[in-house]
Structures are given as structure tokens and as C-alpha cells.
Amino acid sequence: MKFDVLTLFPELFNTVMGESIIGRAQKNRLVEVNAVNIRDYSKDKHKKVDDYPFGGGNGMVMMCQPVIDAYKAISEGMEQKPKVIYMSPQGKVLTQEMAKELSKQEHLILLCGHYEGIDERIIEEIIDEEISIGDYVLTGGELPAMVLIDCVSRLIPGVLSTEGSFSDESHFNGLLEYPQYTRPADYNGNKVPEVLLSGHHANIEKWRMQQSLDRTRDKRPDLFNKLPNKNLL
């Protein structure tokens, strides 16, 4: 899967996305993250990419020309237009279900806003969907884009060692993940639950499911209330 990221700070992606699981996925050619510097497409002699908002107001707004020209440079000659996502606080909040759907795409283009936002005509011309990672404000769209890339890439076959690596995680099946333990079995008198040491796999699975249900009910009642047949759980 290919991610083209339109950004003013490509070096952030070259550093962070080259490490850990995503870095390995790129080396194995399962994922490609290509950071495109919007400033390279500015026709201004000073490579300016922003200007004052019409009607007044604080801050600067990213201009149409550099952004749309950067997009055209990526998509030119393609038979099928890639899905273009604007990382925006006004978008739908990213969920695991959304990530599953996005992982079915072969190519995504992510636009990272900055300053006070982008010219509305960019959204009208090239954006298919706006996505947020939460109801709060960040300096730019780079961190949200990295979150989306990480979340989606984990669902691509081969990126993780086994499917179980993500199918047991929090949110994958609508539940929070059960507690995890490692050695030693007794740390300063705080012991690992006996069932995990028993070797009885059916009992372990039953314990884990109950723990997931309890955690979801206690920590995220909003998720628990969405579960089907929750009254029978």
C-alpha cells in the first residue's frame, strides 16, 4: 500500500516512518510512505505557500496553487484516482472500523494542513474525505497523518507477524484488550493471575474475554453500550 503525504515538513515522516514496524514494512515493500514537500510546488520566488485570509482574521491560510499542483504531480497519469484525505479537526474521528476500510485501498493521499487551515477551494477540488484523530487542536496535520498511517498499515497482511497480533488488541473487535503480564510471575508480592500460569487454554481464553468485557464496561462505557447483545454478556 502506498501513502503519499502532502506536507510542509517531509523530514518528520522520513524519520518517524522509517522506524519500528512501519520501517520494517517499508523495507519489505508492504508499505510505501512518500512525503511530498508542498513548498517545492510553489510558484512564488520565495516558495511561499500561505497568505492572509480574505475578510480578515488571525493567522495565515495555505494557498490553492502549491497544494493542488503537488496533488496533480502525484496523480497525473493514474488510471484510477487515489482517495485523498485531509487531516482536519473538522473531519470524522478515526476509528478502527474506518482504518479497516482504508486498509483495503491500494493508494492514499494524505494532506497535512498548517497555519489556520487551507483554502476551502482545495477541499472542493481534490478532497474525498476529512479525518480527525480527536476533538482537540494540533499545530498541523503531520501527527494525525502518522497516526492514520500506523493504524492502517498494521492491518495490511504481512505487516505484523501474525493476525493475532492485532485481532486481540483494544478496539479491534469493539472491546478493550485484556491485561498482559510477563516475567517474573511474582514482582514484589504482586502475582500474575493463576489462570495464566495454568496452561489451560480454554480457561485462559475465557478469562481474557471476561477481562476485556469488564475493562470495556468500566473504562469505556460508550463502547460497551454499542456491543450487540450486551445485556447477555
UniProtKB/Swiss-Prot annotation:
Name of the protein described by the UniProt record: tRNA (guanine-N(1)-)-methyltransferase
Compartments (UniProt record): Cytoplasm
Keywords, in A-Z order: Cytoplasm, Methyltransferase, S-adenosyl-L-methionine, Transferase, tRNA processing
Record function comment: Specifically methylates guanosine-37 in various tRNAs.
EC identifiers of the protein: 2.1.1.228
Protein family: Belongs to the RNA methyltransferase TrmD family.
Binding-site residues, S-adenosyl-L-methionine: G113, I133, G134, D135, Y136, V137, L138
Keyword set includes Glycosyltransferase: no
Catalytic activity: guanosine(37) in tRNA + S-adenosyl-L-methionine = N(1)-methylguanosine(37) in tRNA + S-adenosyl-L-homocysteine + H(+)
GO MF annotation terms: tRNA (guanine(37)-N1)-methyltransferase activity
